[in-house]
């Protein structure tokens, strides 16, 4: 027959330390925890095999194709410092294994069945290098950072947002009223919470209409362009598109999608529609922590961030470093650069395993949201820079005088920080002084400073560098 039946060790075929990676290969860095007694070479080779051409036994149909051309290869293994039984296994995948322009297909291969593999105790995808040839098959974000600034006519500062709370339970009219007050008070955007879709107490069409009214009224009164992230996420792709189309008919500037719960296929369709019709697309990452919070299993958020830039979105939530949700500074800034910049050098100190060239794919604006308030403004301005959205939900709506004064307090704090930075002051060292000085001529800011002066969320980060 010319083929030898039976089970053979993966490493005989899939562990190739002499392999020179090609510019067209997709490269992956996996954190592998093998079962006791399984050598790291076998574990790394098993990952390469099960996520590409291999299966558990030799099959005669292997002879009908060129495995050498199509197989994934584990080409390097490093022990993880400080962890006795963990290894970083580097795997190279030939580009032909993947459908063009499909994040869905890429993930189905690379993070598919292999994560349930018995020979491994745990497996985490730490990073991916997307080759230029593959990047070029994606449209990417509908518009990108510069086009968004031009559409909004806002330059030289971070943008300000607010998630409307309580997230569930308001009627459409009251919801629209809260949006109007925040936008009128000085914010650039208000936002649907990720789980606001179309519930019995507030159907989507009513919400869209009242929010559009809030946008137009506040624009007329302030002379600034305003927006509300209308969440188009729905139970079916068709319904999602229907909502996006209605938003466009209302003439609003931006819609929103929950890209992990909604799925990459739906997200990419929506991103294409948004580019074709001039809508900005805000992305919420609900469900990300299910995938990325465990240190030894799952997928790091930097991979989900890269996937989103390929699939398409103009904003994405990216942690705050200082608020109530997880995120260590160096790691967060690492994937913030991966979202915004055109070319990112390998830098293991920030968790970046590969040099990534996006070849002019538009950038994504990171959104800092979750447990932040006016006292955080100097740190946020310094950490995230101008190309970011700073979102204060409770930090706006929790103001003792109401929503509009809460919005005004945030806007004054932001303008004060940007001015201080532009004058060459050190925001990290003088932040509190800058806020105090500004609050002398803004009673709204003074009241906000008083309410939140003692609030801190101080826990040790789970997602740390080794």
Swiss-Prot record:
Free-text description of this protein's post-translational modifications in UniProt: The disulfide bond which can form in the large chain dimeric partners within the hexadecamer appears to be associated with oxidative stress and protein turnover.
Binding site for Mg(2+): 191, 193-194
Compartments, record wording: Plastid, Chloroplast
Cofactor(s) the protein requires to work: Mg(2+)
Note accompanying the cofactor annotation: Binds 1 Mg(2+) ion per subunit.
Enzyme Commission number, as recorded: 4.1.1.39
PROSITE patterns reported for this sequence: RUBISCO_LARGE
Record site feature (Transition state stabilizer), residues: 324
Active site annotation, chain numbering: 165, 284
Single annotated GO MF: ribulose-bisphosphate carboxylase activity
Keywords annotated in UniProt: Calvin cycle, Carbon dioxide fixation, Chloroplast, Disulfide bond, Lyase, Magnesium, Metal-binding, Methylation, Monooxygenase, Oxidoreductase, Photorespiration, Photosynthesis, Plastid
Major location category of this protein: plastid
Family in the record: Belongs to the RuBisCO large chain family. Type I subfamily.
Stored PANTHER family: RIBULOSE BISPHOSPHATE CARBOXYLASE, RIBULOSE BISPHOSPHATE CARBOXYLASE LARGE CHAIN
Known partners and oligomeric status: Heterohexadecamer of 8 large chains and 8 small chains; disulfide-linked. The disulfide link is formed within the large subunit homodimers.
Protein name (Swiss-Prot/TrEMBL): Ribulose bisphosphate carboxylase large chain
């Amino acid at each position: 027959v010319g083929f030898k039946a039976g089970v053979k060790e993966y490493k005989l075929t899939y562990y190739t330390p002499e392999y020179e990676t090609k510019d067209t290969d997709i490269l992956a860095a996996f954190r592998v925890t093998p079962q006791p007694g399984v050598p790291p070479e076998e574990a790394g080779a098993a990952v390469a095999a099960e996520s590409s051409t291999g299966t558990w036994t030799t099959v005669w149909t292997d002879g009908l194709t060129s495995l050498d051309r199509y197989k994934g290869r584990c080409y390097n293994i490093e022990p993880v410092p400080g962890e006795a039984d963990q290894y970083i296994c580097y795997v190279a995948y030939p580009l032909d294994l993947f459908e063009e322009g499909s994040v869905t297909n890429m993930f189905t291969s690379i993070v598919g069945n292999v994560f349930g593999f018995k020979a491994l105790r745990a497996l985490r995808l730490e990073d991916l290098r997307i080759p230029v040839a593959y990047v070029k098959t994606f449209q990417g974000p509908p518009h990108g950072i510069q086009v968004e600034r031009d559409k909004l006519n806002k330059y030289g500062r971070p943008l300000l947002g607010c998630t409307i709370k309580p997230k569930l339970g308001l009627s459409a009219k009251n919801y629209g009223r809260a949006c109007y007050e925040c936008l009128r008070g000085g914010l650039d955007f208000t936002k649907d919470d990720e789980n606001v879709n179309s519930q019995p107490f507030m159907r989507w069409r009513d919400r869209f209409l009242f929010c559009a009214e809030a946008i137009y009224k506040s624009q007329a009164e302030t002379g600034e362009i305003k927006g509300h992230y209308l969440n188009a996420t729905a139970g079916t792709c068709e319904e999602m598109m229907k909502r996006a189309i209605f938003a466009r008919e209302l003439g609003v500037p931006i819609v929103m999608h929950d890209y992990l719960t909604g799925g990459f296929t739906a997200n990419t369709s929506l991103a294409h529609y948004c580019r074709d019709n001039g809508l900005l697309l805000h992305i919420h990452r609900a469900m990300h922590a299910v995938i990325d919070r465990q240190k030894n299993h799952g997928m790091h958020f930097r991979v989900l961030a890269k996937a989103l830039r390929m699939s398409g979105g103009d904003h994405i939530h990216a942690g705050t470093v200082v608020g109530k949700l997880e995120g260590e500074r160096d790691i967060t800034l690492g994937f913030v650069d991966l979202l915004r910049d055109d070319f990112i050098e390998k830098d293991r100190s920030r968790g970046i395993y590969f040099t990534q060239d996006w070849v002019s794919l538009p950038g994504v604006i990171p959104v800092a949201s979750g447990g932040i308030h006016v006292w955080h403004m100097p740190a946020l301005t310094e950490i995230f820079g101008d190309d970011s959205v700073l979102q204060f939900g409770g930090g706006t709506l929790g103001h003792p005088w109401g929503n509009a004064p809460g919005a005004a307090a945030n806007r004054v704090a932001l303008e004060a920080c940007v001015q201080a930075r532009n004058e060459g002051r050190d925001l990290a060292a003088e932040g509190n002084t800058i806020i105090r000085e500004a609050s002398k001529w803004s009673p709204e800011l003074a009241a906000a400073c008083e309410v939140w002066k003692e609030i801190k969320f101080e826990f040790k980060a789970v997602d740390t560098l080794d």
